[in-house]
């Protein structure tokens, strides 16, 4: 019997404002539309995806902790926490769930403070600057990764 893989899609602060927030950097697509696309892909691949967005570090950390031994892969856009949150990094390391770091914009073409990530060196991969398509690429990478386990 084949196992149905479980993926957690985590989105950090202000991503609930996608579509209205700085379309020059983030495009005009809503987070809801991104989540719907990932759910469609999940159905096509017989995978369960839970989507979660929070504007607070505590809620994101708690969700990661709840995922321990419950989730096979995490897709995370830490948003502004990318550059500030050792706590989120530590939570991901604590649960030992492989993850991909996603950014809609190319953080390396933006302000210098956005160039550093507390996640990149411990992520399976990093996707940035590809807009909403980056979520799809991250999902497909997760499928390949899990197929090889």
UniProtKB/Swiss-Prot annotation:
**Where do the annotations place substrate binding?**
77, 83, 90, 104-105, 114
Keywords assigned by UniProt, alphabetized: Amino-acid biosynthesis, Aromatic amino acid biosynthesis, Lyase
- According to its UniProt record, this protein's enzyme class is lyase
The positions annotated as site (Transition state stabilizer) read: 21
Q: Which PROSITE patterns match?
A: DEHYDROQUINASE_II (PS01029)
**What Enzyme Commission number(s) appear in the record?**
4.2.1.10
What is one process in the GO biological process aspect for this record? aromatic amino acid family biosynthetic process
What Gene Ontology molecular-function terms does this entry list?
A: 3-dehydroquinate dehydratase activity
Enzymatic reactions: 3-dehydroquinate = 3-dehydroshikimate + H2O
Catalytic-site annotation from UniProt:
26, 103
User: In which pathway is this protein known to take part?
Assistant: Metabolic intermediate biosynthesis; chorismate biosynthesis; chorismate from D-erythrose 4-phosphate and phosphoenolpyruvate: step 3/7
What does the record give as the function of this protein?
Answer: Catalyzes a trans-dehydration via an enolate intermediate.
Q: Give the multimer and partner information.
A: Homododecamer.
| UniProt xrefs under PANTHER family | CATABOLIC 3-DEHYDROQUINASE
What family does the database annotate? Belongs to the type-II 3-dehydroquinase family.
Q: What is this protein called?
A: 3-dehydroquinate dehydratase
Query: According to the entry, what is the taxonomic lineage of the organism?
Result: Bacteria, Pseudomonadati, Pseudomonadota, Gammaproteobacteria, Pasteurellales
